[in-house]
Protein backbone atom coordinates (compact mmCIF):
# COMPACT_ATOMS: atom_id res chain seq x y z
CA UNK A 1 0.00 0.00 0.00
CA UNK A 2 1.26 3.49 -0.80
CA UNK A 3 0.54 4.88 2.64
CA UNK A 4 1.86 3.40 5.84
CA UNK A 5 -0.63 1.51 7.93
CA UNK A 6 -0.04 4.01 10.72
CA UNK A 7 -1.10 6.84 8.41
CA UNK A 8 -4.12 4.84 7.29
CA UNK A 9 -5.15 4.05 10.86
CA UNK A 10 -4.71 7.68 11.87
CA UNK A 11 -6.92 8.75 9.00
CA UNK A 12 -9.49 6.10 9.81
CA UNK A 13 -9.53 7.09 13.47
CA UNK A 14 -10.18 10.65 12.38
CA UNK A 15 -13.13 9.44 10.33
CA UNK A 16 -14.46 7.54 13.35
CA UNK A 17 -14.37 10.75 15.36
CA UNK A 18 -16.29 12.47 12.59
CA UNK A 19 -19.08 9.92 12.23
CA UNK A 20 -21.63 12.63 13.04
CA UNK A 21 -19.99 15.30 10.87
CA UNK A 22 -22.73 16.02 8.35
CA UNK A 23 -24.07 18.88 6.32
CA UNK A 24 -27.77 19.57 6.77
CA UNK A 25 -29.91 22.53 5.75
CA UNK A 26 -29.83 25.27 8.36
CA UNK A 27 -32.96 25.49 10.52
CA UNK A 28 -33.96 27.24 13.71
CA UNK A 29 -33.04 24.12 15.70
CA UNK A 30 -29.85 24.06 17.70
CA UNK A 31 -26.99 21.94 16.41
CA UNK A 32 -27.42 19.49 19.30
CA UNK A 33 -31.15 19.16 18.64
CA UNK A 34 -30.54 18.47 14.96
CA UNK A 35 -27.89 15.89 15.81
CA UNK A 36 -30.21 14.15 18.27
CA UNK A 37 -32.99 14.09 15.71
CA UNK A 38 -30.72 12.69 13.03
CA UNK A 39 -29.37 9.96 15.30
CA UNK A 40 -32.90 8.60 15.64
CA UNK A 41 -33.60 8.47 11.92
CA UNK A 42 -36.39 6.00 11.12
CA UNK A 43 -36.23 4.69 7.54
CA UNK A 44 -39.35 3.96 5.55
CA UNK A 45 -40.27 1.51 2.83
CA UNK A 46 -41.23 2.29 -0.75
CA UNK A 47 -42.94 -0.15 -3.12
CA UNK A 48 -41.31 -0.62 -6.50
CA UNK A 49 -42.38 -2.75 -9.45
CA UNK A 50 -40.03 -5.54 -10.53
CA UNK A 51 -40.04 -8.06 -13.38
CA UNK A 52 -39.91 -11.73 -12.40
CA UNK A 53 -38.11 -14.07 -14.79
CA UNK A 54 -40.14 -17.17 -15.64
CA UNK A 55 -37.42 -19.52 -16.96
CA UNK A 56 -37.85 -22.97 -18.50
CA UNK A 57 -37.62 -26.03 -16.26
CA UNK A 58 -34.42 -27.15 -17.99
CA UNK A 59 -31.70 -25.60 -20.08
CA UNK A 60 -30.66 -21.97 -19.81
CA UNK A 61 -31.97 -18.50 -20.50
CA UNK A 62 -30.24 -15.14 -20.77
CA UNK A 63 -32.10 -12.08 -19.55
CA UNK A 64 -31.18 -8.49 -20.30
CA UNK A 65 -30.52 -6.02 -17.51
CA UNK A 66 -31.08 -2.33 -18.18
CA UNK A 67 -29.91 0.73 -16.31
CA UNK A 68 -32.47 2.72 -14.36
CA UNK A 69 -32.80 6.49 -14.08
CA UNK A 70 -29.94 6.37 -11.58
CA UNK A 71 -27.67 4.65 -14.11
CA UNK A 72 -28.99 5.36 -17.62
CA UNK A 73 -25.73 4.29 -19.29
CA UNK A 74 -25.56 0.94 -17.53
CA UNK A 75 -26.48 -2.36 -19.12
CA UNK A 76 -25.86 -6.02 -18.53
CA UNK A 77 -27.17 -9.53 -18.69
CA UNK A 78 -27.74 -12.52 -16.45
CA UNK A 79 -27.46 -16.06 -17.74
CA UNK A 80 -29.53 -18.57 -15.79
CA UNK A 81 -28.62 -22.25 -16.04
CA UNK A 82 -31.42 -24.44 -14.72
CA UNK A 83 -30.17 -27.42 -12.74
CA UNK A 84 -32.13 -30.19 -11.08
CA UNK A 85 -31.82 -28.57 -7.65
CA UNK A 86 -30.62 -25.00 -8.11
CA UNK A 87 -30.13 -22.23 -10.62
CA UNK A 88 -26.65 -21.01 -11.54
CA UNK A 89 -26.48 -17.30 -12.30
CA UNK A 90 -23.69 -15.66 -14.29
CA UNK A 91 -24.17 -11.90 -14.40
CA UNK A 92 -22.15 -9.03 -15.80
CA UNK A 93 -22.74 -5.33 -16.19
CA UNK A 94 -20.98 -2.35 -17.73
CA UNK A 95 -21.52 1.39 -17.76
CA UNK A 96 -21.76 1.63 -13.98
CA UNK A 97 -19.72 4.23 -12.16
CA UNK A 98 -18.37 3.71 -8.67
CA UNK A 99 -21.00 3.16 -5.96
CA UNK A 100 -19.72 6.29 -4.23
CA UNK A 101 -21.01 8.41 -7.09
CA UNK A 102 -24.47 8.05 -5.51
CA UNK A 103 -23.33 9.28 -2.11
CA UNK A 104 -20.42 8.96 0.29
CA UNK A 105 -22.17 6.13 2.15
CA UNK A 106 -22.24 3.76 -0.84
CA UNK A 107 -19.39 1.30 -1.28
CA UNK A 108 -20.69 -1.72 -3.21
CA UNK A 109 -23.25 -3.03 -5.71
CA UNK A 110 -25.41 -5.91 -4.49
CA UNK A 111 -27.53 -8.20 -6.66
CA UNK A 112 -30.84 -9.47 -5.28
CA UNK A 113 -33.38 -12.12 -6.25
CA UNK A 114 -37.03 -11.29 -5.47
CA UNK A 115 -39.72 -13.96 -5.71
CA UNK A 116 -43.28 -13.37 -6.97
CA UNK A 117 -44.42 -13.72 -3.34
CA UNK A 118 -42.16 -10.86 -2.28
CA UNK A 119 -39.35 -12.77 -0.60
CA UNK A 120 -35.86 -11.43 -1.19
CA UNK A 121 -32.56 -13.29 -1.41
CA UNK A 122 -29.16 -11.67 -1.59
CA UNK A 123 -27.19 -13.18 -4.47
CA UNK A 124 -24.00 -11.32 -3.56
CA UNK A 125 -21.88 -8.27 -4.24
CA UNK A 126 -20.82 -7.60 -7.81
CA UNK A 127 -17.05 -7.61 -8.22
CA UNK A 128 -15.34 -4.89 -10.24
CA UNK A 129 -13.21 -6.31 -13.05
CA UNK A 130 -11.76 -3.55 -15.18
CA UNK A 131 -14.66 -1.48 -16.45
CA UNK A 132 -17.20 -4.22 -15.73
CA UNK A 133 -18.91 -5.72 -12.70
CA UNK A 134 -19.47 -9.47 -12.47
CA UNK A 135 -21.12 -11.99 -10.17
CA UNK A 136 -21.51 -15.75 -10.21
CA UNK A 137 -24.12 -17.07 -7.79
CA UNK A 138 -26.56 -19.91 -7.14
CA UNK A 139 -30.18 -19.90 -6.07
CA UNK A 140 -32.52 -22.63 -4.84
CA UNK A 141 -35.42 -20.45 -6.00
CA UNK A 142 -36.19 -20.91 -9.69
CA UNK A 143 -38.42 -17.93 -10.52
CA UNK A 144 -37.37 -14.47 -9.39
CA UNK A 145 -36.75 -10.86 -10.32
CA UNK A 146 -33.19 -9.55 -10.43
CA UNK A 147 -32.24 -6.07 -9.27
CA UNK A 148 -28.87 -4.50 -8.52
CA UNK A 149 -28.69 -1.80 -5.86
CA UNK A 150 -26.01 0.56 -4.58
CA UNK A 151 -25.39 -0.27 -0.92
CA UNK A 152 -23.14 0.95 1.92
CA UNK A 153 -21.97 -2.57 2.76
CA UNK A 154 -22.51 -6.11 1.54
CA UNK A 155 -24.13 -7.27 4.78
CA UNK A 156 -27.30 -5.20 4.32
CA UNK A 157 -30.42 -7.27 4.99
CA UNK A 158 -32.92 -5.42 2.77
CA UNK A 159 -32.27 -3.76 -0.60
CA UNK A 160 -32.29 0.02 -0.74
CA UNK A 161 -34.32 1.84 -3.36
CA UNK A 162 -31.03 2.85 -5.04
CA UNK A 163 -31.72 0.48 -7.95
CA UNK A 164 -29.20 0.78 -10.78
CA UNK A 165 -30.04 -2.32 -12.87
CA UNK A 166 -33.23 -4.28 -13.38
CA UNK A 167 -34.71 -6.93 -15.66
CA UNK A 168 -36.12 -5.77 -18.98
CA UNK A 169 -39.80 -6.56 -19.43
CA UNK A 170 -40.40 -9.33 -21.96
CA UNK A 171 -42.38 -12.44 -22.84
CA UNK A 172 -40.56 -14.50 -20.19
CA UNK A 173 -41.24 -12.06 -17.34
CA UNK A 174 -44.23 -11.26 -15.13
CA UNK A 175 -44.92 -8.19 -12.99
CA UNK A 176 -44.41 -8.21 -9.22
CA UNK A 177 -43.52 -5.70 -6.51
CA UNK A 178 -41.33 -5.34 -3.44
CA UNK A 179 -40.86 -2.86 -0.60
CA UNK A 180 -37.39 -1.32 -0.75
CA UNK A 181 -35.65 0.66 1.98
CA UNK A 182 -36.18 4.33 1.19
CA UNK A 183 -33.94 7.28 1.86
CA UNK A 184 -30.35 6.12 1.38
CA UNK A 185 -30.02 5.39 5.13
CA UNK A 186 -30.43 9.04 6.09
CA UNK A 187 -32.97 11.87 6.16
CA UNK A 188 -33.37 14.09 3.13
CA UNK A 189 -30.53 16.60 3.01
CA UNK A 190 -28.23 14.59 5.26
CA UNK A 191 -24.73 14.20 3.82
CA UNK A 192 -22.33 11.55 5.06
CA UNK A 193 -18.70 12.57 5.48
CA UNK A 194 -16.65 11.08 2.61
CA UNK A 195 -14.31 8.19 3.38
CA UNK A 196 -10.83 8.27 1.85
CA UNK A 197 -11.41 5.74 -0.91
CA UNK A 198 -8.19 6.73 -2.67
CA UNK A 199 -5.85 5.74 0.15
CA UNK A 200 -5.87 2.02 -0.57
CA UNK A 201 -8.15 0.85 2.23
CA UNK A 202 -9.64 -2.61 1.69
CA UNK A 203 -13.34 -2.43 0.91
CA UNK A 204 -14.13 -4.44 4.05
CA UNK A 205 -12.73 -1.60 6.17
CA UNK A 206 -14.73 1.09 4.39
CA UNK A 207 -17.89 -1.01 4.62
CA UNK A 208 -17.31 -1.51 8.36
CA UNK A 209 -17.14 2.27 8.83
CA UNK A 210 -20.30 2.76 6.82
CA UNK A 211 -22.13 0.16 8.90
CA UNK A 212 -21.00 1.80 12.15
CA UNK A 213 -22.07 5.30 11.26
CA UNK A 214 -25.39 4.15 9.76
CA UNK A 215 -26.18 2.16 12.92
CA UNK A 216 -25.23 5.22 14.98
CA UNK A 217 -27.54 7.39 12.88
CA UNK A 218 -30.36 4.93 13.59
CA UNK A 219 -29.84 5.36 17.33
CA UNK A 220 -28.42 1.87 17.85
CA UNK A 221 -25.33 2.71 19.93
CA UNK A 222 -26.83 1.41 23.16
CA UNK A 223 -27.78 -2.11 22.12
CA UNK A 224 -25.75 -5.29 22.56
CA UNK A 225 -25.17 -5.90 18.85
CA UNK A 226 -23.63 -2.45 18.47
CA UNK A 227 -21.38 -3.07 21.47
CA UNK A 228 -20.20 -6.36 19.96
CA UNK A 229 -19.56 -4.60 16.67
CA UNK A 230 -17.62 -1.87 18.43
CA UNK A 231 -15.40 -4.41 20.18
CA UNK A 232 -14.50 -5.91 16.81
CA UNK A 233 -14.17 -2.43 15.30
CA UNK A 234 -11.59 -1.46 17.91
CA UNK A 235 -9.83 -4.81 17.52
CA UNK A 236 -9.55 -4.25 13.75
CA UNK A 237 -7.95 -0.85 14.25
CA UNK A 238 -5.52 -1.92 16.97
CA UNK A 239 -4.56 -5.17 15.20
CA UNK A 240 -3.90 -3.43 11.89
CA UNK A 241 -1.75 -0.81 13.59
CA UNK A 242 0.19 -3.47 15.48
CA UNK A 243 0.73 -5.75 12.47
CA UNK A 244 1.26 -2.90 9.99
CA UNK A 245 -1.15 -4.42 7.50
CA UNK A 246 -4.70 -5.63 7.01
CA UNK A 247 -4.46 -9.42 7.21
CA UNK A 248 -7.21 -11.84 6.19
CA UNK A 249 -8.02 -12.37 9.86
CA UNK A 250 -8.39 -8.63 10.41
CA UNK A 251 -10.58 -8.27 7.32
CA UNK A 252 -12.71 -11.15 8.57
CA UNK A 253 -13.16 -9.28 11.84
CA UNK A 254 -14.20 -6.20 9.88
CA UNK A 255 -16.90 -8.21 8.09
CA UNK A 256 -18.14 -9.58 11.42
CA UNK A 257 -18.23 -6.06 12.87
CA UNK A 258 -20.30 -4.95 9.88
CA UNK A 259 -22.76 -7.77 10.50
CA UNK A 260 -23.16 -6.74 14.14
CA UNK A 261 -23.70 -3.09 13.22
CA UNK A 262 -26.37 -4.07 10.67
CA UNK A 263 -28.07 -6.29 13.26
CA UNK A 264 -28.00 -3.35 15.69
CA UNK A 265 -29.59 -1.06 13.10
CA UNK A 266 -32.34 -3.55 12.26
CA UNK A 267 -33.09 -4.17 15.94
CA UNK A 268 -33.72 -0.47 16.49
CA UNK A 269 -35.61 0.50 13.33
CA UNK A 270 -37.30 -2.85 12.61
CA UNK A 271 -36.52 -2.95 8.88
Predicted regions and their residues:
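Bacterial N-terminal signal peptides that target proteins for export
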Residues: 2-12
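Bacterial N-terminal signal peptides
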Residues: 10-20
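Long, charged/polar, soluble alpha-helical segments
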Residues: 29-38, 44-52, 56, 66-70, ...
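Exposed aromatic-hydrophobic patches
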Residues: 90-93, 98-99, 130-139
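Short beta-strands and strand-coil junctions in structured, solvent-facing domains, enriched
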Residues: 97-101, 119-120, 154-157, 239
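Short coil-to-beta strand junction motifs in C2/discoidin
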Residues: 102-109
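Surface-exposed loop/edge segments in extracytoplasmic proteins
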Residues: 117-125
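Noncatalytic modules at the cell exterior or secretory-pathway interfaces
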Residues: 140-147
Amino acid sequence: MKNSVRHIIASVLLVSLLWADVSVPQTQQSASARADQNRKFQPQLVTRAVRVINPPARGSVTTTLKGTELAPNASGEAKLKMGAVEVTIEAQASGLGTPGSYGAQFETYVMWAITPAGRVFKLGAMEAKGNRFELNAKSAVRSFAIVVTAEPYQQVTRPADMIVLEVVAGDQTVAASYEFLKGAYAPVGYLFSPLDTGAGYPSQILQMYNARRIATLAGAKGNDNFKMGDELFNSVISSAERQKKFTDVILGQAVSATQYFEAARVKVVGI
